[in-house]
């Protein structure tokens, strides 16, 4: 069956079917191959992506800017000072105006409602580059990486250790839709959003996967195929950083913890990493680590998303 995602917003991966997610991953793989062999793929020739950044980023800005260029389009960088939002213009009006100039909008925001409002009022596709609730592009790059390294997603044990944040949400959603056995281990009080837990359980029931929430990292990583972690204090949580370090230290991914995983496990992190906090050097720099493959795959996964929703290519 041919799948078209033309005109779709990409706000949260729960909005997509398994077949649609597999289409994005297949397209990402194709983009990576074309890039490697030097095959032109300017499917967005003459199109413009507005890139709104409420918060700074290394990987998101570079990967989207390079990606839209490789697809033949142009990326227009807009920070908070470039827009009239601070002077009282609403997100609704901003979305309507931008839609008259550009062919797609990518937004990296603090509050997930902002990207939802952009999508509500824009007449062009809106892509969530990161919000406090969801990080869909990261999860797509993550599962592209897992497919490359393991050859499958169905039935793999994918363990997230740490804070039940936006990265955990998207990893849970996509993994359970794609048939993985997803385990999340957090300190008590730092679990993922209950709504996302419910989605993960429902997705797993439909896909043949499973979902489990634990508070013991050793139990969680037993026989893991994938171990994933993220920073303990996200941007905007700096005031809590010291308290979080104390609470999360038992959840550090170190050489003792990973001994409980399968010998050929892969270690994942969305970066930037706080070495010596959520992960030790001997893990992130080990042969099991694929963190820089993940970072590269942000480029290919996001190119797939842009090509599918802005260019209307069908796979």
From Swiss-Prot:
UniProt xrefs under InterPro entries: Asp/Orn_carbamoyltranf_P-bd (IPR006132), Asp/Orn_carbamoylTrfase (IPR006130), Asp/Orn_carbamoylTrfase_sf (IPR036901), Asp_carbamoyltransf_Asp/Orn-bd (IPR006131), Orn/put_carbamltrans (IPR002292), OTCase_ArgI (IPR024904)
Keyword Amino-acid biosynthesis part of the UniProt annotation: yes
Subcellular localization: Cytoplasm
Gene Ontology biological process terms in this record: arginine biosynthetic process via ornithine; citrulline biosynthetic process; L-arginine biosynthetic process
Catalyzed chemical reaction(s): carbamoyl phosphate + L-ornithine = L-citrulline + phosphate + H(+)
GO cellular component: cytoplasm
Keywords tagged on the record: Amino-acid biosynthesis, Arginine biosynthesis, Cytoplasm, Transferase
Pathway participation: Amino-acid biosynthesis; L-arginine biosynthesis; L-arginine from L-ornithine and carbamoyl phosphate: step 1/3
Major localization class: cytoplasm
Source organism superkingdom: Archaea
Residue ranges of coiled coil: none
Enzyme Commission code(s) on record: 2.1.3.3
Functional summary from the UniProt entry: Reversibly catalyzes the transfer of the carbamoyl group from carbamoyl phosphate (CP) to the N(epsilon) atom of ornithine (ORN) to produce L-citrulline.
PANTHER family xrefs: ORNITHINE CARBAMOYLTRANSFERASE, MITOCHONDRIAL, ORNITHINE TRANSCARBAMYLASE, MITOCHONDRIAL
Name of protein: Ornithine carbamoyltransferase
Record lineage: Archaea, Methanobacteriati, Methanobacteriota, Thermococci, Thermococcales
